[in-house]
């Protein structure tokens, strides 16, 4: 029963996220639901994913540049391997970092 409840909670959470339209509202939303440490972890994961997508730095260079561990980078790399190629392209083009490439 707890598993179904968690799945419903996650679905409801994602539905709520989809209704947020501005960066300011997202900032307030995540300040409510995530601790400072969780937000820092999410920011690190974002930077790792973006660096991996850019494919310009080695994992060691990414670790040094962003102050993250090789294990964190490996987890990000493994997660990217499981992502649909279309979603990966969406991530590349949504960040604004790849517009001139």
From Swiss-Prot:
It comes from the Bacteria. One of its GO terms (cellular component) is cytoplasm. One of its GO terms (biological process) is negative regulation of DNA-templated transcription. Keywords: Cytoplasm, DNA-binding, Repressor, Transcription, Transcription regulation. It is found in: Cytoplasm. The keyword tRNA-binding does not apply. InterPro entries: Trp_repress, Trp_repress_bac, Trp_repressor/repl_initiator, TrpR-like_sf. SUPFAM superfamilies: TrpR-like. GO terms for molecular function: DNA-binding transcription factor activity; sequence-specific DNA binding. Residues 59-82 bind DNA. Its main location: cytoplasm. Pfam families: Trp_repressor (PF01371). The keyword Metal-binding does not apply. Belongs to the TrpR family. Homodimer. This protein is an aporepressor. When complexed with L-tryptophan it binds the operator region of the trp operon and prevents the initiation of transcription. This is Trp operon repressor homolog.
């Amino acid at each position: 029963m707890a598993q179904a409840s968690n799945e419903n909670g996650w679905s409801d959470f994602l539905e709520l996220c989809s209704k947020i339209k501005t960066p300011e509202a997202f900032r307030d939303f995540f300040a409510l639901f995530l601790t400072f440490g969780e937000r820092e972890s999410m920011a690190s994961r974002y930077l790792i994913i973006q660096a991996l997508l850019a494919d310009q730095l080695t994992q060691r260079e990414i670790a040094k540049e962003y102050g993250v561990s090789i294990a964190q980078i490996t987890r990000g790399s493994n997660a990217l391997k499981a992502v649909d190629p279309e979603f990966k392209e969406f991530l590349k083009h949504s960040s604004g970092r790849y517009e001139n490439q």
